[in-house]
């Protein structure tokens, strides 16, 4: 199973989701069955490391942070089993790269997997303060945990 997390620039939300999910996958012993990556719908930050503020926030919670920003491309539809958008704008931008709708069934909103929060989108913390980064991590921990539970059931069946 291959998962792709997607936000705008691939320096805050989607790399956070990728690194949180990787930690949860490792903890569940599913590293051989689930592979994660992340991308951005824009090319603003291609090649950059994750945002320093997000990296610091993740490390404070014990996460290992790795990865470099890359852009989402139409080839990703065939490469990944599930593509998880952080917000509605990115969801629509992803779908726009598949005009025939062949892969629309693979694209979901990450917040569809949250249970503890009412948020329908993961807000972009880039221009906000520290509390915004913490809220994003809280949302993603919840969503990734529930997603992993769902995938674990699929992988067993």
From Swiss-Prot:
GO terms for molecular function: protein tyrosine phosphatase activity. It is an enzyme of class 3 (hydrolase). It catalyses: O-phospho-L-tyrosyl-[protein] + H2O = L-tyrosyl-[protein] + phosphate. SUPFAM superfamilies: Phosphotyrosine protein phosphatases I. Keywords: Hydrolase, Protein phosphatase. Belongs to the low molecular weight phosphotyrosine protein phosphatase family. This is Putative low molecular weight protein-tyrosine-phosphatase slr0328. It comes from Synechocystis sp. (strain ATCC 27184 / PCC 6803 / Kazusa).
């Amino acid at each position: 199973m291959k998962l792709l997390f997607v936000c705008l620039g691939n320096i805050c939300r989607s790399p956070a989701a990728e690194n949180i999910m990787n930690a949860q996958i490792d903890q569940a012993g599913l590293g051989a069955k689930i592979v994660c990556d992340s991308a951005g719908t824009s090319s603003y930050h291609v090649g950059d490391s994750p945002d320093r503020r997000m990296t610091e926030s993740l490390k404070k919670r014990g996460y290992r942070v790795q990865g470099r920003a890359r852009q989402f491309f139409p080839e990703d539809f065939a490469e990944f089993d599930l593509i998880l958008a952080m917000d509605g704008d990115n969801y629509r931008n992803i779908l726009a790269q598949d005009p025939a709708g062949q892969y629309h069934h693979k694209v979901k909103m990450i917040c569809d997997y949250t249970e503890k929060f009412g948020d329908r989108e993961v807000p972009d913390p880039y221009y906000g303060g520290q509390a915004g980064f913490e809220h994003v991590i809280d949302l993603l921990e919840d969503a990734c945990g529930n997603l992993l539970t769902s995938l674990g059931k699929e992988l067993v069946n």
